[in-house]
Amino acid sequence: MSEPSAAVGQRPGGESAPAHRLWGGRFTAGPAESVAALSRSIDVDWRLARYDLRASKAHARVLAAAGLLDADELAQLLAALDELDRACASGTFQPAAADEDVHTALERALLERLGPLGGKLRAGRSRNDQIATDLRLYLRDHVRLLVRRLVDLQWALVDQAERHLDLPAPGMTHLQHAQPVLFAHHLLAHVAAFARDVDRFRDWDRRAAICPLGAGALAGSSLPLDPHAVAAELGFTAPAANSIDAVSDRDFAAEFAFAAALVGVHLSRLGEEIVLWCSQEFGWVELDDAYATGSSIMPQKKNPDVAELARGKAGRLIGNLTSLLTMLKGLPLAYDRDLQEDKFPVFDSLDTLLLVLPAMTGLVATMRVKADRVAAAAPAGFSLATDVAEALVRRGVPFHEAHQAVGRLVAWCAAHGTDLSAVDDDQLAEISPYFTPENRAEVRTVLSVRGAIGARAAYGGTAPERVAEQLAAVRAALADSAAWADAAP
């Protein structure tokens, strides 16, 4: 067995490796240079090499079990595949410039090492079921890495929430002050969004865990191969039940792209808030120097580029999903060469998230919350108005009338430049007959931020005891998600 070549596309002696194709018997000439260039995908799919080798080992074993390889041939093939796997991992084997795709490069390497025996491995399989298998294997591994990164970000948000458990903040709708909440409650809302992302990826894995290998080009194989054995060895739950669907299905790729795009949307929303929070107008957080940048002309600037780039890359992730769905929408069964384009958007979405998530995690973990500024903003904008209305409801006033009465109270305060808590009893009585002495006493109990927050004690609300419950549930869920991410598929 020869040593792997040290130079890309060259034999050990230095001469160029001839073009190797997995097809061509019926052709009298090779493809035009422009066609070869158009067809080539090796620069994109080479990252699948070790997964292709892993699938090849499983395929070699079922060939042997079917009597199509003897014990010595199987041993030689497995040894060559192991050696090639090490060479790919170390980078000592690289594809040649003329290799069309990952399958071509690896078969060429086997033929160079084993001669005709290397060609026996292709029996009973096609590039169609190979690539579908490789891509599923690759994504199932890397989705767990994504989930781990999402868990890290959620922990950063949880840590900030725990450091500011008692900090009141203005809850907003339409970016206007609405009702006071705990800042921890707000951060946990982002945790909830990312938790759904984790759940989506975990649910995606259940559907992606179907093995296409054995489907051949589209119709299955006439050879007595055992697809259940291949599926089990590769960590799949079952082989594909329909060989045509096995090679044509890219739902798993589209679902991945959707889940990735939604992560991007959630990162963008978090990023947008951080951009606002660190502005002079809000002044709620100070970014760590390691997670901010400056200006080439304005010396005073400290820019939230990490948050802005996360926001910007959401469009890229959405575009990848659109690209993939548009490519898939008109394809007749079974395999079409259009499917070669599935890897560009999928890999880009994966790479983008693996780039953004650690940076956003560091940004969140290191940002300093200016608690005084946040707390001071909590009661602004008549944010206790709903609490006043609900205090009247507890006293038996229909909500419609309570809403009208408090609306008049807010209008009076706005006209007189004062706040709700500053209105005296006589003024309340003049504003609405519903502000009776008994009702006024109830209203006074909620005219504080702490009182209003404490009153929101329904399940899922912002009262301190409810937020503590949310934190406990989140910690348990994160531990479970981390365990799933760290386990092999």
Swiss-Prot record:
Q: In which pathway does it act?
A: Amino-acid biosynthesis; L-arginine biosynthesis; L-arginine from L-ornithine and carbamoyl phosphate: step 3/3
A single GO BP annotation from the record?
A: arginine biosynthetic process via ornithine
Keywords assigned:
Amino-acid biosynthesis, Arginine biosynthesis, Cytoplasm, Lyase
Ranges annotated as spanning the membrane: none
Location within or outside the cell: Cytoplasm
Q: Which reaction does it catalyse?
A: 2-(N(omega)-L-arginino)succinate = fumarate + L-arginine
Q: Spell out the residue ranges making up region: Disordered.
A: 1-20
Q: Which CDD domains match?
A: Argininosuccinate_lyase
Per its record, what are the GO molecular function terms? argininosuccinate lyase activity
Supply the EC number(s). 4.3.2.1
Query: Any one cellular component term from GO for this entry?
Result: cytosol
Q: In its keyword annotation, does this UniProt entry include Protein biosynthesis?
A: no
Q: What's a Pfam family in this record? A: Lyase_1
How would you classify this enzyme at the top EC level? lyase
The yes or no answer to whether the keyword Repressor is present is no
The UniProt similarity line reads:
Belongs to the lyase 1 family. Argininosuccinate lyase subfamily.
Name of the featured protein: Argininosuccinate lyase
Instruction: Name the species this protein comes from.
Output: Acidothermus cellulolyticus (strain ATCC 43068 / DSM 8971 / 11B)
Q: What is the lineage of its organism?
A: Bacteria, Bacillati, Actinomycetota, Actinomycetes, Acidothermales
